[in-house]
A protein has these predicted regions:
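Residue-level structural signal for beta-strand termini and adjacent loop
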Residues: 96, 109-110
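Intrinsic-disorder/low-complexity, polar/charged segments enriched in Ser/Thr/Lys/Arg/Asp/Glu/Gln
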Residues: 3-9, 62, 76-78, 90-92, ...
Length: 128
């Protein structure tokens, strides 16, 4: 059962594939904002997945974060998340990303609990 206060943690090393200049979000050799957001989403998703029934997953629906400090290639970055709101199937998380010099990004992220088979079937109707 999903409850308020569930915490998550994920970390990674900023490799060349995670740089803004590599993914096209900029020309500088720094941790790309879209991939910081990916780290935040993954941290939230993995934190609650063990509490969901089989066949259920969460999908990201809203991101409200600031990327406040650049991180160069080779540094470790990590994200902490905390589930701070539950409204039916909507989950709201506080997210904070850091490197060894401090906070690099923070904000909130919302996810919805979905039945995977039903969600995929509904989405696939767009192909018809």
């Amino acid at each position: 059962m999903v409850e308020l206060g569930i915490k998550g943690y994920q970390e990674e090393i900023v490799t060349p594939e995670l740089l803004a200049c590599h993914i096209g979000s900029g020309t500088v050799r720094v941790f790309a904002t879209p991939l910081m957001i990916t780290l935040m989403e993954r941290t939230c998703r993995l934190s609650v997945q063990p509490y969901l029934d089989e066949g259920f997953e969460t999908v990201g629906t809203h991101v409200n974060v600031s990327h406040v400090s650049a991180t160069p290639e080779g540094m470790k970055v990590w994200c902490d998340s905390e589930l701070i709101g539950i409204d039916g199937r909507r989950l709201t998380f506080k997210v904070v990303a850091q490197d060894s010099h401090g906070i690099i990004g923070e904000g909130t992220h919302e996810r919805f609990i979905v039945n995977v088979a039903r969600f995929q079937a509904k989405t696939d109707t767009k192909l018809e």
